[in-house]
């Protein structure tokens, strides 16, 4: 019975990690699109501000690009060092 509980925890964790990674990728893609579109709108309105706008775009795009990698690190932690398994084993008295 205990093995089934542990397997259920790993299965739920795998599903959760998949959803989290998909959401992080989708959020990053939407963020990239918004950043680039607003930068192009700003350049179209004020072409002389192009260098400043491009600098800001690359800074914020770098921050946006780092978000999925941070989420990936948390996902790997949940997959390989799952804190819920230890809690379940303690609750079951193993």
Curated annotation (Swiss-Prot):
The record marks 65 as: Reversibly protonated during proton transport. GO terms for cellular component: plasma membrane; proton-transporting ATP synthase complex; proton-transporting two-sector ATPase complex, proton-transporting domain. It is found in: Cell inner membrane. The keyword Lyase does not apply. The chain crosses the membrane at residues 15-35, 58-78. F-type ATPases have 2 components, F(1) - the catalytic core - and F(0) - the membrane proton channel. F(1) has five subunits: alpha(3), beta(3), gamma(1), delta(1), epsilon(1). F(0) has three main subunits: a(1), b(2) and c(10-14). The alpha and beta chains form an alternating ring which encloses part of the gamma chain. F(1) is attached to F(0) by a central stalk formed by the gamma and epsilon chains, while a peripheral stalk is formed by the delta and b chains. F(1)F(0) ATP synthase produces ATP from ADP in the presence of a proton or sodium gradient. F-type ATPases consist of two structural domains, F(1) containing the extramembraneous catalytic core and F(0) containing the membrane proton channel, linked together by a central stalk and a peripheral stalk. During catalysis, ATP synthesis in the catalytic domain of F(1) is coupled via a rotary mechanism of the central stalk subunits to proton translocation. Key component of the F(0) channel; it plays a direct role in translocation across the membrane. A homomeric c-ring of between 10-14 subunits forms the central stalk rotor element with the F(1) delta and epsilon subunits. NCBIfam families: ATP_synt_c, PRK06876.1. HAMAP family: ATP_synth_c_bact. This is ATP synthase subunit c. It comes from Hydrogenovibrio crunogenus (strain DSM 25203 / XCL-2).
């Amino acid at each position: 019975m205990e093995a089934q509980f542990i397997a259920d925890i790993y299965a739920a964790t795998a599903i959760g990690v998949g959803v989290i990674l998909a959401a992080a990728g989708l959020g990053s893609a939407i963020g990239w699109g918004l950043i680039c579109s607003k930068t192009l709108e700003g350049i179209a309105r004020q072409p002389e501000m192009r260098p400043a706008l491009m600098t800001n775009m690359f800074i914020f795009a770098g921050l946006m690009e780092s978000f999925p990698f941070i989420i990936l690190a948390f996902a790997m932690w949940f997959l390989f060092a799952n804190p819920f398994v230890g809690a379940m084993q303690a609750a079951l008295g193993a």
